[in-house]
Amino acid sequence: MRNLKFYICVLLALAILAGCATTKFDVVSKPGTDLTKCDNFLVCSNIEDAVFKADLESRFVDKLTANGKKAVEGTKAKSDSGSDYILDVKLLSSSIKLDHKKIGPAFPVSFKLEIGESHEVTEKVTMSFDISVTDTKTNEMIFRGTVTSDSEESTEAGCVNAIFSSVASNTVKKYFVK
């Protein structure tokens, strides 16, 4: 019974860790630019899939508004949104890597022969984004960066969900709020 509790704790810890995404930044910005002082954003994305596009834009809007900024999704905005800045999130690349791991015999065998084996397949999705901020008054790009994030989940949708959350959350936290 003690071993069962231990294994359950280990499985829960692995489940929590598996839902994480790592995010890396590489940015340049106009000298003197402080995005923490910017407000009122129009968030746009170039993703063709309407569901993913709306999801990514809404993640940034949610994170910005939760941190006291005004923001509207490009998919919901009219042609003149009245925004002071345009936050443009473009998908540069995405890739999926499948890992195939042997996790042991499929059933207990009393001999040294392994009659059946159990395997686990995990997906690692990596996505890179170009993120830019343009001042609508001067039509000048004041910030531009590349963000790369990856995640390992049991499904592609789970990976994309973790990546979108990580990219939006980490970008807003790192550059848009103090």
Where do the language-model regions lie?
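A structural "domain/chain start" motif
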Residues: 19-76, 176-178
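A general structural signal for short secondary-structure junctions and capping/turn motifs
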Residues: 2, 77-80
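Surface-exposed short loop/turn segments
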Residues: 80-141
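Solvent-exposed loop/turn segments at secondary-structure junctions
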Residues: 48-50, 92-96, 149-152
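C-terminal/domain-edge helix-coil "capping" segments
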Residues: 20-36, 118-178
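Sec-dependent bacterial lipoprotein signal peptides
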Residues: 1-20
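Structured loop/turn residues at beta-strand edges in well-structured enzyme cores
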Residues: 15, 36, 81
